[in-house]
Structures are given as C-alpha cells and as structure tokens.
Regions:
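N-terminal pre-domains immediately preceding structured catalytic cores
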Residues: 2-214
Length: 214
C-alpha cells in the first residue's frame, strides 16, 4: 500500500486539481469494451510493464486518452499539427505510431513557464490570461514530455526520427485552439492538463501511440 501511495496522490491531484473536465463523453469509443486491449501490444508484440501508462492520441478526434491499470483514466483535448501527419524532418507534421516518453522536463516549473530548447527561460512566465493567444507566437510552456519513436523506419531512425525532430507533449499559450490541429508537429495540451499528465506518468514506463482515430 505504501508503494501505491505516491501514485494515488498523483492521480488525485491530477484529476481533482489540475485536469480539465474529462472529455470521454464526447468520445464514447474509449469506454467501449476492447478499447484498452486494442492498445496494449507494443511493437513486436511486446507487452508493456505492469506499471506502465499507455497514452493514445487520436489525430482525427484531437484528443488524448490516458490508460493506466487497465482502464481509461481521463481524456484530454489536444492540438496536433496543422500540416497533418508525417515523420520527415522539417515537415512540421505529427508522426504516427508507437513512441515512449524518453524524458520528462520541467517538473518544478511554475505554470506558464516558457521553455526554449527544453530549458526554462529565467523570468519568462506567461500568466494564465496569456494562455489563450499571445501575439500569435507559439510557446512551449509548463511541462515537456519528449517522445522517442519505437518503430524503425516509421518514427525512429534516419529521416523519420521523432526524438531528433523534438516531438513533445507540452503546454501551450494557444489553449483556445485545443480540439483542432494547430501545432508545428508536437502534441499540445492545456497547461493544467500537461501538469496532470506529467504527474501521472513521471518515473513510470510511458508509451504513446499516435493514431489516425480512436
């Protein structure tokens, strides 16, 4: 029980304080029998660790489902790339397929902290009133989950590598665009939601499957 306490506290904090209202009512497919099982097998048929988190991002639905303990815990609205899906460098497209979270960045940052090249910019913090558009600029805010592709030739390796393309899940100052494509390749979440996802996944094996639709 003691080992589970940090996870229970993180889940409680993430769902009750940070996270936006669960959006699964708008995506009933995620609550249907078989949804979790359909996203349980990693590339090569490998099964995820028992304490793993599975994140499924649907491009068509512009939504992210977080799976833990064999159930969907929460569905969040996202923005993927306005240019569509793809894996080529400089395409500004969101890559499909399986990834893992390679690095969690910004766990101690205050909400609205601006990051450049994954480093917090001292003194540059956007207030919550600036999270719904700030002069048209696209900021990386609050938290970063840096993705690493797991499928060689699709999102891993020369010419398609998600990690070297700096594909992140991150907070944004364009929260008003969530629910529709708007990014330059990354997966945007609201700043409260990215804090929730960070809290629920940090230190645990976390796999991200980016799909055309749920």
């Amino acid at each position: 029980m003691r080992a589970l306490f940090p996870l229970i506290m993180a889940a409680s904090l993430a769902t009750s304080v940070f996270a936006s209202p669960d959006a699964s009512a708008d995506f009933p497919v995620v609550r249907r029998p078989g949804f979790v099982a359909a996203h349980a097998a990693l590339p090569g048929g490998r099964r995820a660790e028992t304490n793993a988190v599975i994140i499924v991002v649907s491009v068509a639905d512009q939504a992210l489902a977080l799976i833990s303990g064999g159930e969907v815990l929460h569905v969040y609205r996202v923005s993927t790339a306005v240019a569509g899906v793809g894996s080529k460098p400089n395409s500004e497209k969101t890559p499909l397929g399986w990834h893992r979270v390679a690095e969690w960045i910004g766990g101690d940052a205050v909400p609205g902290q601006v990051f450049v090249s994954r480093k917090p910019v001292p003194g540059e913090i956007l207030r919550h009133t600036q999270w719904r558009g700030d002069g048209g600029r696209d900021y990386v805010l609050t938290r970063i989950l840096w993705l690493d592709g797991l499928e060689y030739g699709r999102n891993r390796g020369p010419g398609v590598d998600s990690h070297s393309r700096f594909i992140y899940i991150h907070g944004t100052n364009q929260e008003h665009l969530l629910g529709r494509p708007a990014s330059h390749g990354c997966i945007r979440l609201s700043n409260h939601d990215v804090m929730a996802v960070y809290a629920l996944t940090e230190g645990r094996p976390t796999y991200v499957e980016i799909v055309d639709r749920f």
